[in-house]
């Protein structure tokens, strides 16, 4: 009877440990620190309620203020990433001891392996998805820009030659929140980019830790803009994802299996 009781208690302790891990309520984490490494711009909010790069906002201030944002690899000289060979990184730290690293895109990332199979590199995947999206507007824009009924392969070559990918490589990070293993962040962009060739509805591209994020279609009206020709920062693209289970949980499951196996052997 005593041996049976000990066996029950040992098994119960493993189950209780697992239960505590899986059923612990998610807690919203507070961002405690935010630092940028590399070329960047900070856009604060001016007295008119619009974004302004002439600001005394810190990186943390910008991420905690509605409408403000941090542009990675950004410059006022042109609308492309400053450095396509070296990524600008934004590191956010939280009071749950977790860290998220946001990165501008580089030539190595565009030319690197694609998340999906069937593509030689990420640039091919991104362009294929954008071209075939009914919401991006890319096909009509490219055809209007070229002046003829251009096909996808020719358009892709043109994008590569004209370095259009650079224009999507300097993401504006507006906010970052974390609740347990759930992460949500906003990219600031155009509500509807439009020029003489047509309109585009596409977010910029950002890497978070080892994952790449982007979107096509309508942005959410941010209520602010940068007062430039294309009304930058007037749209928001929101992304949410779940961080995979930590290795500690897998280790705990393995320990539970080992305990059970050991006890089975002891009974023989």
Residue ranges and their predicted role:
Residues 1-30, 231-262:
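Short, threonine-centered small-residue motifs that mark membrane-proximal processing/anchoring sites
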Residues 29-242:
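Helix-boundary and membrane-interface capping/anchor signal
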Residues 264-268:
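Short, charged juxtamembrane terminal tails flanking transmembrane helices
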């Amino acid at each position: 009877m005593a041996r049976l009781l000990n066996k029950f208690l040992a098994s119960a302790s493993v189950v209780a440990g697992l239960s505590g891990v899986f059923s612990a309520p998610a807690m919203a984490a507070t961002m405690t620190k935010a630092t940028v490494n590399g070329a960047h711009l900070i856009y604060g909010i001016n007295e008119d309620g619009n974004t302004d790069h002439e600001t005394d906002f810190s990186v943390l201030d910008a991420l905690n203020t509605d409408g403000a944002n941090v542009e990675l690899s950004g410059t006022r000289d042109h609308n492309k990433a400053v450095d396509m060979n070296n990524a600008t990184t934004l590191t956010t730290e939280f009071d749950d001891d977790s860290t998220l690293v946001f990165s501008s895109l580089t030539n190595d990332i565009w030319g690197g392996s694609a998340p999906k199979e069937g593509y030689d590199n990420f640039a091919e995947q991104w362009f294929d998805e954008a071209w075939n999206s009914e919401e991006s507007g890319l096909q009509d824009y490219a055809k209007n820009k070229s002046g003829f009924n251009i096909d996808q392969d020719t358009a892709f070559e043109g994008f590569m030659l004209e370095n259009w990918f650079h224009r999507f490589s300097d993401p504006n990070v507006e906010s970052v929140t974390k609740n347990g293993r759930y992460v949500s962040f906003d990219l600031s962009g155009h509500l509807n980019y439009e020029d003489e060739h047509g309109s585009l509805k596409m977010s910029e591209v950002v890497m978070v830790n080892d994952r790449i994020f982007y979107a096509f279609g309508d942005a959410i009206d941010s209520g602010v803009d940068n007062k430039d020709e294309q009304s930058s920062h007037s749209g928001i693209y929101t992304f949410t994802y779940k961080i995979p289970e930590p290795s500690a949980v897998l280790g705990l499951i393995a320990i539970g299996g080992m305990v059970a196996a050991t006890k089975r052997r002891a009974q023989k």
